[in-house]
């Protein structure tokens, strides 16, 4: 069974795959408190349900399938029980999804750009992560992070974000496990071939950081998470650089690559 990595209380789409319930990084450890300064917690009245990445003081990138009504974003968070003094909360002022996205295909152009209602300030636990300067290289060691469940089959939510190292894999290593993937979806395949480390449900929208660069957005994967031969699927950020820059520059009619 395959799920998109979102909330448990969202309705499951009756498609060839289902949306993922919120779970966290499986096979990881608690993140260092200072290593996830760009990680954004997206939440509503039910709690955290997605993550995002701060790319400058006014803009966040996440997955399009994380879009919902009445959500807020928390910056500088680590423990859900012990607040950092520099935590900041913002509302979305504007949300941008590719106008040429195929609405009936969740994997297609699974990226959303959010303008904040006011800018955030850099601090000890808050700093943006810039867009990638070049495409990622197969074999790169990549970092994943999030507040999702730390167990693959039942929901076990941690109070802190978990992190893990995985590898960027060749698309050919993903195709057998995900025959529905199409080249035009512009995705990356990353994980551990033998399984055991993976993003999961509530990690949707969070970053895949390879060699210090923001290369992917958590999008899609198998359920249970962390299966062998079924790595995670991530939206390729580099392919959307021009669209993101155009929107930020004020060209709100810009379209994404086909």
Swiss-Prot record:
Keyword Zinc: no
Gene Ontology CC, one term: secretory granule
Highest taxon above the source species: Eukaryota
Entry's Gene Ontology molecular function annotations: serine-type endopeptidase activity; toxin activity
Glycosylation sites: 44
Compartments, record wording: Secreted
EC annotation from Swiss-Prot or TrEMBL: 3.4.21.-
Residues annotated as catalytic: 65, 110, 204
Catalytic class of the enzyme: hydrolase
Propeptide: 19-24
UniProt tissue specificity: Expressed by the venom gland.
Limits of the Peptidase S1 domain: 25-249
Disulfide topology: 31-163, 50-66, 98-256, 142-210, 174-189, 200-225
Subunit structure, as described in the record: Monomer.
Name this polypeptide is given: Snake venom serine protease PA
Organism: Trimeresurus stejnegeri (Chinese green tree viper)
